[in-house]
């Protein structure tokens, strides 16, 4: 049986832009994507700490420090809001025993402040 687990988390990212006219998605700093293993067009869940909104969307790579809510998701937050971005995976019970997610705590400029090892 496969189970759903947290694979990666960007904790307390700061929204730097909201573009209602874009087709959709969330733009995330390419360096952060590399560090977490999140791929372009991968589905992610996003939780807005400021207003409690939660939504699912897909990722597109962006510039250094960039976190942009695009299209309809631009209605889910404003510049300056803090968000948590989650990526999940399905793994077997055997794989789960030694599995560790990648968790990055970010500062207000979306730089890695700390990598949490669980």
Name every feature range the model reports, one short phrase each.
Residues 2-4, 11:
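A cross-kingdom feature strongest in bacterial/archaeal respiratory oxidoreductases
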Residues 5, 15-16, 20-97, 108-111:
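Compact, glycine-rich, soluble single-domain proteins
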Residues 102-118:
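Short, glycine/charged-enriched hinge/interface segments at domain edges or termini
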